[in-house]
Structures are given as C-alpha cells and as structure tokens.
Amino acid sequence: MNKLLIFAALALLTASPAMAQEWGNLKMKFLLGGKAPTPMKIVVTKDVDFCGRHGLVSELRTVGKGGELANVVVYLQANPAKIHPDYEAELKKEVKIDNAKCRFERHVSFIRTGQKLIIGNSDPIGHNTKADFFENTPFNDLIPSKGSITKVFDKAEKTPSGISCSIHPWMAAHLLILDHPYAGISNDKGELEIKNLPVGKHTFTVWLEPRFVTQITGQQLKRGGKWDVEVKAGNNDKGTLTIPQ
C-alpha cells in the first residue's frame, strides 16, 4: 500500500512540469522598412470649431522615431483545440473604443465573441459610429456627447473590420473579432506578445492596414498573410522583424 502511495505521489510530481510545458509565449518587435512617411494632415470639414483644433493626421501608419511600427496585427485564424485556462477570466473584461478629439482611441482593437464592446464618446459633440462586417450584424449608431453603446458579437471575422463615423468621414478604426484569445497588436514601440499559446506549429495571419502583410524581414508569407511559426514551451522571441512599406 505504501509503495502505491509513493508511486502515485511521484507520478503527480513528474506530471506537473509536463503540464507546465504545454504552453509558450510568442514575442516580437516590428519595424517599418525604409523611411517613414510623413503623416498626412486631415482636412476637417465638419464641426470645425472643435475638431479643427486637434491637429489631426492620418493614422494609416503610426511609426516611431526609430521605425517602430504600431498596429501590426498577428493572430491565429483557426480556433485551437486547447485554450489556456487563464484566458477564461478575460471574457468578463470589457473592450473599450472611445470617440476622443474627433478620432478613435484605439485605432486597432481586438475582441472575442461573447465579450462586451463599449464604444464611448468623450467629445462635446455627437458621433455616429458605423461598423461593417462579413459575419456579424453591421451597425450605424448615433452616440451623443458623453454617451456610449454596447455591442456583443457572436461570430469570428477573418480580418479586422472597419469602423467609421458617418458624421466625420476622416475617422477610421479597425476591430478584430475572434472566437479565441490568440491575437496581438503591436504597440507604439512596435512590440507584440501573445501569451500561453499551445505548443506546436501554428499558422498565424499578419495584417497591417489596409491589407495582409506579404513579407517579413525578407521572408515571403503565404497568400492571405499566412506565417508558419513553431511555438516551443516557455518564451519564444522572434526578435526584431521588418515589414516593407
């Protein structure tokens, strides 16, 4: 009997590290190849007294002084068989997009199906938020000053979907909707991390407004921005990657 207990205890001890090795973190940093374009100034044609005071520029490319490239989206297209249990709590968190100073904050966002999206309006003027989808029901809602709307999506989308303001035509943002948590968006430093991926070979989609990325640091990606990556247990740092203009 004692031998059986000892054997069972040893089995538990040896199983725990194996379970811990089923997951890996994927990290990378994106730079824009070549000289960064000068952001195009926005011509304000509506609510000029308020919107015209903010020095608005196009956010098609947000590039740091060292070429750091923001808003690169990397995500698994398919829902993996395994999802790390730590992500369960994130479904209860709200994702927020704000109409602020006649632009959207953030420019690119990610949400999971079943998660709440809150679109607010911090401005003293009204905004009309319009979103078009392939799989989900589109909407076109007026949001008064200091107001908000709440949306929940049922289906995943294959690409980030466009969001605009019908009143202020220069306003643009994108929203990626997936039925799993494995996506990342590069920050102002060009940095992106996707945590607790299942170990193994994965095919990611790489997207940078307005299209799929075709090349990373000289490596040609498959059609539709498909990028094959082997994720090993622990940390996987892809280093600094360059996307051509």
Residue ranges: model-predicted function:
Residues 19-245:
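Extracytoplasmic copper-binding redox domains, predominantly the cupredoxin/blue-copper superfamily
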Residues 1-4:
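Positively charged n-region of N-terminal signal peptides that target proteins for export
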Residues 7-15:
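Bacterial N-terminal signal peptides
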